[in-house]
Amino acid sequence: MERITVNLAERSYPISIGAGLFEDPAYLSQILSNKNANQKVVVISNVTVAPLYAEKILSQLEQLGCDASLLELPDGEQYKSLDTFNQVMNFLLEGSYARDVVIIALGGGVIGDLVGFASACYQRGVDFIQIPTTLLSQVDSSVGGKTAVNHPLGKNMIGAFYQPKAVIIDTNCLSTLPEREFAAGIAEVIKYGIIYDGAFFDWLEENLDRLYALDEEALTYAIARCCEIKAEVVAQDEKESGIRALLNLGHTFGHAIEAELGYGNWLHGEAVSSGTVMAAKTSHLRGLISQEQLDRIINIMRSAKLPVHTPDTMSFDDFMTHMMRDKKVLSGQLRLVLPTGIGSAEVIADTPQDIIKQAIDFGRDI
């Protein structure tokens, strides 16, 4: 079992990573140790994940003397919305839950982001715990306190920075994850190697097969390394005013794909993969990376069974309309996270539109 701490002074919290953590109530017991007897806990999940894991969590909570209840939400990116947020608020208000309630987000990135935002808003903030069940949420969205819902005009535009009290990652959950969802998570894993750790990227090139075979040692190492990197970055820049923006490699292009094609038609990680190729090509056109480095990025995404092409139905204008709504835009200027090598990246603001267009069009011919 691996244990990592996100160091944020009085808001620091642990990340526990290992196989079979759901079977051991000790992890929840440690987190809830300072709570009241008969502590009220709400587990929020979706209709796909709840039948697999909710009963285990509820049983553990009951063993600990908690008064636990379950809210099941619809499954899918399209439900990461204000309508579903209101459904959560109605459940909490109708249940007369007080400010000392603990909320557990049991699911993937949609559940984690939505439940985190609801926890930030309910009575101006209640404690919540992340129990991510997809690879993407385990390596990225459950760590760092970004919470949000989508708006038809943009992804994650309504949200808050709100840290969990703990993150519990059981790698056994990945055995029930469809391969397409697993691959979407691998896109975020690869991202960490590109922006921060060239040696980790090298390791991924050699070990993708082990990850897809759900090799426990390889999975634990990869997830822990991603969480270590994210914890280091978040500790330096919690509110994304500097280095944390590098974690958005591929996301400016990728969010445009998700918004234009409809949330859920491309999985988030699929859009990030395509967006990362466009960002890498932008870097190549600007002379920031070599042809060999560009090829390595494209090849690892292909090896991971991820899309590297630009969606045929999206024009340059479609991309720019959405990208100019990106949260990194400052004073009307588009800023892109661009790799400057394998293991490094920068936020760069002065990319000419003709280069961006060339990068987008490059993906049409791959």
From Swiss-Prot:
Zn(2+) binds at E188, H251, H268. One of its GO terms (molecular function) is 3-dehydroquinate synthase activity. GO terms for cellular component: cytoplasm. GO terms for biological process: amino acid biosynthetic process; aromatic amino acid family biosynthetic process; chorismate biosynthetic process. Its cofactor is Co(2+); Zn(2+); NAD(+). NAD(+) binds at residues 75-80, 109-113, 133-134, 146, 155, 173-176. Binds 1 divalent metal cation per subunit. Can use either Co(2+) or Zn(2+). It catalyses: 7-phospho-2-dehydro-3-deoxy-D-arabino-heptonate = 3-dehydroquinate + phosphate. It is found in: Cytoplasm. Pathway: Metabolic intermediate biosynthesis; chorismate biosynthesis; chorismate from D-erythrose 4-phosphate and phosphoenolpyruvate: step 2/7. Catalyzes the conversion of 3-deoxy-D-arabino-heptulosonate 7-phosphate (DAHP) to dehydroquinate (DHQ). This is 3-dehydroquinate synthase. It comes from Vibrio campbellii (strain ATCC BAA-1116). The lineage of its organism: Bacteria, Pseudomonadati, Pseudomonadota, Gammaproteobacteria, Vibrionales. The gene is aroB.
